[in-house]
């Protein structure tokens, strides 16, 4: 199975359209998979027995999730068959105090809980959602927050934050006349969204280091493509989708440490801390590692933390594992050179019409696109 589904440059779509993880048990012989992981990071591992029996690892086993059959693709949410994710995110790095953080959690929780009240088109899904009311209040910016404030503060905020959400869920579920949520917290991978607030993504350290190119994909019919081209951004056709263009944005993160400065054991340790004190669902974590220096530590790390996580995946560091990766590390000189070549984006052109594409005001807008009229 791992060989068949692993990434193949000659047939990339097969692996990219699947979630290549193994349902492991405590005591699995992880050494059998180290060579595959060192090649391209696959397979990942999920521990269904932990997901079914535990919420937070700081709390006793409760067995509430005995119906769980798997995870969502990024593995932050254990799910029953036909169950959906309901996710909302809080940025740790945007809070001035713990009180400010706890207040944000209230509104994040209320949004997530409200979404569980909305029916879907599938009757079987509605039944599961009404029974579980599962939500995933996620944190991002955890690694940089830990670097700046220390792990004791991280544990304190997480533990008190979790208990605060549980208190709100008890009160508001009674008020709404619905069940309390089976699980309420999680950690998403949060790659793109974290860029908006300058946060490190989810539980990860900055993948691209201090200076990097962030690859973001746009449909070829997206009017933004014309603006990026006019401004001189580096663009190239997506190698997988013929209808998609990859645009590379230069980023100076300014984070205290990047992923290459952090050991494999510290990375998995922070994920376990988050699973223990914050997330009663799961923690989406991809452990980057130095292929030459840390491959020998992969199996020991898994044996050490297999009972303290619900899922984990790996990725060798560097820019050559996969083409068109989300993050490509560059030097300061390369960053300055690229920034010097690009122009300021003319955002007003979206509404003035660009190359026969005109956005119809704010009609039918989602978070990503608006209705487009093709002249």
Language-model features and meaning:
Residues 1-63, 136-166:
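Conserved, charged catalytic cores of large soluble enzymes
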Residues 1-12, 124-125, 170, 181, ...:
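Domain-level cores of phosphate- or acyl-group-handling catalytic modules
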Residues 10-11, 17, 29-33, 38-42, ...:
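Short, well-ordered loop/turn elements at secondary-structure boundaries
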Residues 35-37, 44, 54-121, 131, ...:
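Catalytic alpha/beta core of large soluble enzyme barrels
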Residues 94-99, 120-125, 146-157:
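Inter-helical turn/loop segments and adjacent helix faces that build the functional surface
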Residues 120-132, 179-180:
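Active-site-adjacent structural elements in folded domains
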Residues 164-192, 198-200, 352-359, 364:
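Flexible, glycine/threonine-enriched loop-and-boundary segments that flank and lead into catalytic domains
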